[in-house]
């Protein structure tokens, strides 16, 4: 309840790292710039939902499509902007209500959003597909924001909770294997043959919220594979692509306690990234991201970049460093992450 949330907030405030003024200024500026994307681009969509991206060079403008994960992060960004003092309660609530007004009328499958929607028509993108990890991300965001706004707007909080409760995550659960399918091909009427079966995965949040909501059994958590490996002397758990995203993204919702498998796994993965970067003399933070390749419309392409020594997949490359990976590492290693971001700024990477 609220008392437990207050206890956690007080503990986190007490344990918050003390960064130097320059690092704090850098992080504050990065946060404000990040919020500015949502501040400007969501109203431009006209439907209260975040466009997928804004591409300035080559000029392509707003990508007028969105996804459940994009929407979830926008809702969290509204709460974070309020927490950081960028906006007041009234703007946060107005934005969340506008988002919910659209979300509640989107076409869904078993209460879950499809992987993509056209923001001009609000129609699902074809072929219609439901992603388990997308659904987990959105449920996590809805639950977080429902608690955050409960005192300011009980009705909005209830709407957020009801949307989360209506998402039938169990429909994607394989009871025979006790694992989640990657997703559902709605056009073809079939579940994916593949499953999310690794603990070191962005799908860890999906597993957690599904168990919490009673939509997956507790034994599912033990079914997630935890293959250990060594990378330059540090140990971690293997992920599929060796990306920072897989190890750290769930921390946004469920920060791992100290002296647990999750934290040791994350520290090992971060150590491997830092060793790799030192050898090459560059910033660390290899993760999935956009990169310098284009389709026929000159849109940047997107793929997973990761460390081969931490990956089970053989087709991975560490060719691209993603600045957002440093932000994901702030809780785990605040000083190192801030220094890494400062170095990126010195190299002219600030957009």
Where are these regions (language model features)?
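Ser/Thr/Asn(+Pro)-rich, low-complexity disordered segments
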Residues: 1-8, 13-351
């Amino acid at each position: 309840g609220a008392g437990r949330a207050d206890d956690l907030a007080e503990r986190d405030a007490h344990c918050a790292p003390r960064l130097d003024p320059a690092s704090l200024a850098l992080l504050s500026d990065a946060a404000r710039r990040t919020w500015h994307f949502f501040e400007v681009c969501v109203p431009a969509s006209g439907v209260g939902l975040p466009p997928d991206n804004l591409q300035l060079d080559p000029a392509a403008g707003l990508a007028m499509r969105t996804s459940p994960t994009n929407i979830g992060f926008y809702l969290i960004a509204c709460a974070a902007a309020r927490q950081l003092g960028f906006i007041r309660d009234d703007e946060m609530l107005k934005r969340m209500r506008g988002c919910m007004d659209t979300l509640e009328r989107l076409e869904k499958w078993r209460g879950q959003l499809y992987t993509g929607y056209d923001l001009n028509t609000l129609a699902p993108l074809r072929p219609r597909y439901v992603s388990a990890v997308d659904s987990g991300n959105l449920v996590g965001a809805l639950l977080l924001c429902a608690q955050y706004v409960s005192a300011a707007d009980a009705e909005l909080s209830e709407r957020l909770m009801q949307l989360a409760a209506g998402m039938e995550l169990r429909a994607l659960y394989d009871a025979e294997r006790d694992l989640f399918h990657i997703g559902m091909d709605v056009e073809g009427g079939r579940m994916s043959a593949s499953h999310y079966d690794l603990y070191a995965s962005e799908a860890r949040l999906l597993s957690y919220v599904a168990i919490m909501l009673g939509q997956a059994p507790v034994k599912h958590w033990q079914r997630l594979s935890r293959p250990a490996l060594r990378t330059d002397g540090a140990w971690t758990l293997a992920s599929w692509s060796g990306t920072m995203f897989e190890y750290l993204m769930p921390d946004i919702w469920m920060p791992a306690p100290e002296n647990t498998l999750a934290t040791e796994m994350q520290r090992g993965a971060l150590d491997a990234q830092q060793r790799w970067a030192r050898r090459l003399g560059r910033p660390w933070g290899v993760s999935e991201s956009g990169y310098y390749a284009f389709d026929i419309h000159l849109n940047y392409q997107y793929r997973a970049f990761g460390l081969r020594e931490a990956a089970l997949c053989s087709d991975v490359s560490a060719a691209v460093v993603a600045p957002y990976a440093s932000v994901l590492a702030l809780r785990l290693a605040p000083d190192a992450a801030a220094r890494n971001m400062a170095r990126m700024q010195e190299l002219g990477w600030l957009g």
